[in-house]
Amino acid sequence: MRSEQISGSSLNPSCRFSSAYSPVTRQRKDMSR
């Protein structure tokens, strides 16, 4: 789980955007898997 958050932060330079897309990113990664 920690790796996921780090990856998202690294991919998204905008911390605020990442926070708002936190639930969307998690679902996207789950679907991709």
Curated annotation (Swiss-Prot):
Compositional bias annotation for Polar residues: 1-25
Domain of life (superkingdom): Bacteria
Renumbered residue ranges of the record's region Disordered: 1-33
UniProt keywords, alphabetically: Leader peptide
Keyword Amino-acid biosynthesis tagged: no
Signal peptide: none
Any one Gene Ontology BP term: transcriptional attenuation
Presence of the UniProt keyword Cytoplasm in the record: no
Function: The rhoL-rho operon is regulated via attenuation by Rho-dependent terminators within the sequence coding for the RhoL leader peptide. It has not been determined if translation of rhoL is required for this Rho-dependent termination to function.
Name of this protein: rho operon leader peptide
Gene from which this protein is expressed: rhoL
